[in-house]
Amino acid sequence: FGSLLGICLMTQIITGLLMAMHYTADTTLAFTSVAHTCRNVQFGWLIRNLHANGASMFFICIYLHIGRGFYYGSYLFKETWNTGVILLLTLMATAFVGYVLPWGQMSFWGATVITNLFSAIPYIGQTLVEWAWGGFSVDNPMLTRFFALHFLLPFMIAGLTFIHLTFLHETGSNNPLGISSNCDKIPFHPYFSTKDILGFLAMLVPLTALAMFSPNLLGDPENFTPANPLVTPPHIKPEWYFLFAYAILRSIPNKLGGVLALAASVLILFLIPFLHKSKQRTMTFRPLSQLLFWILVTNLLILTWVGS
């Protein structure tokens, strides 16, 4: 899935650059500029749909990639694993700030709710929120800085990807048995290159199908309404890939407790290398660990379903 994530990143950067050329980071113009891109720019609709649904593909791939690393004990490459977790956090930040840019109803209220979470931090919380907003409400200053961040972060992700790969090349990659694969090494081309191209097709075909046939399947219909600070949507919820964390946040009645649980749900990944106590690296021959692993997966799926 690593190669797929690389392709995702490249696709997102290319489609994103093409859209940034037609986007205006201003509260009065953002929504109309996106509509203009879809209506009047050559293939603008396709570029936008690929970009929006490409994010979903990105998260599908990264969750599968993390799950596989978890199953096969790849977290024992500590540096690779930790840079990977940092990559995940950066990706989540990028997706969040990007979601705000079209300035639809859910963009606006999602931004309001999530930035407000910072106010749960004792002492500095309120100051932090006003600093993030650039004022006393979600308005133009925040939109412009979110656009700047959304432009910047993908390049940071690209840089971190190289660090991630450099650490991986120090050790070589893992395999399902968790043993040294030096005796099984084969040329990258044509073997791995063919395997990767198959993966690219398996991802890009559903992505183009989604972008062409039902581009709004995963989106929120509220975002067809321009942002209105005076009308709260009936259900404020993020895109599907954040629902598990959002469900955790919402399930805790205390604000600070919810924020901590939300953060912990992702940051727990940093602890995994220290929790490995088995003599075997992978879960291939560990039925009990497998059971716990699949319970975790089911939990995440249930949280995602409950969150919506």
Swiss-Prot record:
One GO cellular component, as annotated: mitochondrial inner membrane
Topology term for the membrane: Multi-pass membrane protein
Additional free-text comment from the UniProt record: Heme 1 (or BL or b562) is low-potential and absorbs at about 562 nm, and heme 2 (or BH or b566) is high-potential and absorbs at about 566 nm.
The protein's name: Cytochrome b
GO molecular function: metal ion binding; ubiquinol-cytochrome-c reductase activity
Residues engaged in binding a ubiquinone: H169
Positions of transmembrane segments: 1-21, 45-66, 81-101, 146-166, 194-214, 256-276, 288-308
Homology family: Belongs to the cytochrome b family.
Binding site for heme b b562: H51, H150
Binding sites annotated in the UniProt record for heme b b566: H65, H164
Record note on quaternary structure: The cytochrome bc1 complex contains 11 subunits: 3 respiratory subunits (MT-CYB, CYC1 and UQCRFS1), 2 core proteins (UQCRC1 and UQCRC2) and 6 low-molecular weight proteins (UQCRH/QCR6, UQCRB/QCR7, UQCRQ/QCR8, UQCR10/QCR9, UQCR11/QCR10 and a cleavage product of UQCRFS1). This cytochrome bc1 complex then forms a dimer.
Cofactor binding summary note: Binds 2 heme b groups non-covalently.
InterPro entries in the record: Cyt_b/b6_C (IPR005798), Cyt_b/b6_C_sf (IPR036150), Cyt_b/b6_N (IPR005797), Cytb/b6-like_sf (IPR027387), Cytochrome_b_C_euk/bac (IPR048260), Cytochrome_b_N_euk/bac (IPR048259), Di-haem_cyt_TM (IPR016174)
Cofactor: heme b
Pfam family, one: Cytochrom_B_C
Cited function: Component of the ubiquinol-cytochrome c reductase complex (complex III or cytochrome b-c1 complex) that is part of the mitochondrial respiratory chain. The b-c1 complex mediates electron transfer from ubiquinol to cytochrome c. Contributes to the generation of a proton gradient across the mitochondrial membrane that is then used for ATP synthesis.
Keywords: Electron transport, Heme, Iron, Membrane, Metal-binding, Mitochondrion, Mitochondrion inner membrane, Respiratory chain, Transmembrane, Transmembrane helix, Transport, Ubiquinone
Signal peptide extent: none
Localization annotation: Mitochondrion inner membrane
Main location: mitochondrion
GO biological process per UniProt: mitochondrial electron transport, ubiquinol to cytochrome c
